Design a protein with these regions (language model features):
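Structured C-terminal subdomain patch of bacterial secreted/periplasmic proteins
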Residues: 160-184, 195, 259-331
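Gram-positive cell-envelope targeting signals
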Residues: 1-30, 143
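Bacterial Sec-exported substrate-binding components of ABC uptake systems
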Residues: 6, 21-78, 176-207, 309-331
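Short helix-initiation/N-cap motifs at beta->coil->alpha
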Residues: 53-59, 108-119, 239-247
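Alpha-helical, coiled-coil/dimerization segments enriched in small aliphatic residues
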Residues: 98-101, 183, 215-242
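Extracytoplasmic ligand-binding site segments that recognize negatively charged/polar headgroups
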Residues: 138, 153-170, 205-224
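Proline-aspartate-enriched helix->loop->beta-strand connector
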Residues: 115-134, 148, 243-262
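A short, structured surface patch at a secondary-structure boundary
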Residues: 70-133
Length: 331
């Protein structure tokens, strides 16, 4: 009898728990607490995304640049000078031989496009090589095996093409957003500098001799466009192709003559073509880096300032050159 009472009490307890237990569990779930044997109620954690740089990737020089370049070699002297002028030279790890600007002196040299120093290129470890001229196919294959991307572009042949190149350089080094701003700002700065050096007084004529025959700066050239913008009248501006027509040689009689540095004045004064020209007789012949004028860089503009000061005595923006050396006509 006593055992039956115990069993009845036990069954009653089970029934009570069955009815009440569901309500208790339901209340716990309403409070956000799950049954111990149920799945854990872990709140969703939002995924942390890396910030997106709007500058990259960017298309520059017709190639996609996926990320900011850190090590760049340059295989063309003028291109290296443009990059230096724009303030990106810290990213340049190597330059070609025969760069004419001071900043290039401290950079490792990698030869030239025609005679590249592949060991020097390998040591420099560039991500990119920028160039105006194409490497030979065999060299290009070796560079590709070094995981170097070679980007070849056209050299500028006019002021407009130079402006476009400056903008592409900015895109390459600074990206799609910053590069646009930096490129436009630099072009505006360059145009302002070009306008500021121009001479507006009474003009004189000048000849720019490359070699002692008929080779000189003529019209239809990048050099002539820059000289004209600066207020210099090129005596050969009506001709083209860097050659003054032999049949019209009598027309060549400028007030001032500028010679490439490798031409000696004595050779000019004893040349049948030049010895009777007014500038030669008046000792108005000067050596100047004519090739540098054709680059169109900041250094080019500085040279043109000195050319202007030499041609026009009242021009104060530059320093006049001394005659190449005392002329045989000098008294």
């Amino acid at each position: 009898m006593k055992m039956k009472k115990i069993i009845l009490l036990f069954l009653s307890a089970i029934l009570v728990f069955s009815f009440c237990g569901c309500d208790i569990i339901s209340d716990l779930m309403d409070m956000g607490i799950q049954e111990p044997d149920g799945p854990a109620n872990i709140p969703d954690v939002p995924e942390v995304l890396e910030p997106v740089d709007p500058n990259w990737p960017v298309t520059a020089f017709g190639a996609e640049i996926p990320a900011k370049p850190e090590k760049v070699a340059v295989a063309s002297p003028a291109l290296a000078e443009y990059i230096s002028d724009m303030g990106y030279f810290e990213k340049v790890c190597a330059v070609p031989e025969f760069c004419g600007f001071d900043e290039a002196a401290v950079k490792p040299k990698i030869g030239s496009v025609r005679l590249p120093d592949l060991e020097a290129i390998k040591s420099a470890e560039p991500e990119y090589i920028l160039t105006f001229a194409k490497f030979e196919e065999s060299v290009l294959i070796e560079l590709q095996q070094m995981n170097i991307t070679v980007i070849c572009m056209d050299a500028p042949m006019s002021l407009d093409e130079l402006r476009t190149l400056y903008k592409e350089i900015a895109l390459f080094f600074s990206g799609a957003v910053d590069g646009i701003t930096e490129g436009e700002n630099y072009v505006a700065e360059y145009d302002s500098a070009l306008s500021a050096l121009a001479y507006s007084g009474e003009k004189k004529t000048a000849g720019f001799i490359r070699a002692l025959d008929y080779m000189m700066i003529t019209g239809g050239t990048f050099e002539n466009e820059i000289l004209s913008a600066a207020g210099i009248i090129n005596v050969a501006e009506n001709y083209s192709g860097y050659v003054f027509p032999e049949e019209n040689w009598k027309e060549f009689d400028p007030d001032v003559i500028f010679l490439n540095p490798d031409i000696h004045l004595i050779d000019l004064e004893t040349s049948d073509l030049y010895k009777k020209k007014t500038a030669v007789k008046n000792d108005r012949v000067y050596n100047v880096d004519i090739d540098a004028i054709g680059i169109g860089s900041k250094r080019s503009l500085d040279i043109i300032k000195d050319v202007l000061a030499t041609v026009y005595g009242d021009y104060s923006g530059g320093t006049a050159y001394s005659p190449a050396y005392p002329s045989m006509y000098q008294k």
